[in-house]
Amino acid sequence: FCLSRGLGDVYKRQTLTFAEDGRTLFGTNPETAALVMTAMGVDAIGVNCSTGPDKMVSVIEKMCRYTALPIVAKPNAGLPQLVDGETVYDMGPETFAQEMCVLAEAGADILGGCCGTTPEHIKKLVEECKDLPLREIEKKHDTIVSSYGQAVILDDMPRIIGERINPTGKKKFKEALKNEDMDYILKEAITQQDK
């Protein structure tokens, strides 16, 4: 199932599926996913299913920049194709193992396979990747705020925070909040953003 490279027992793993555009189905980018999953208190985070290993490299690299947790990579054996009514995956064990070494070099610490992988894929993966050095994990000390889909790093640059959607002293805005008038609230937020 997977090769945990020198990490001992890792229990709580959280992985997400990313499309070829590098985002989840909800539009979350890898950086934000890494931040949110890290904050959840899991032991390892990463990417599963989705695509073949060749399409996961940039996602793994981006996640590594925003977490000190081990990174999981469990791709498919290529992209699924329908052949004679059957789902098949076109990446053989040799190619899969070579591509997984690239993922390990990109920062993945726990390597495995998802759809289309076989015991032979995992055997080749272990043979090819077992002696690769682990990445040096650095503790992160950034201050970051995040929604489900986007993160903002609060660095030394000044941040302008608008008052347009602060309800203090704004009767019309308070009423909009009370009445759940999202059209008005959104219009005010967009007006603030445009200034």
Specify the residue positions occupied by each region the protein language model found:
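Generic hydrophobic/aromatic pocket-lining and core-packing "Φ" positions
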Residues: 30-34, 60, 100, 189
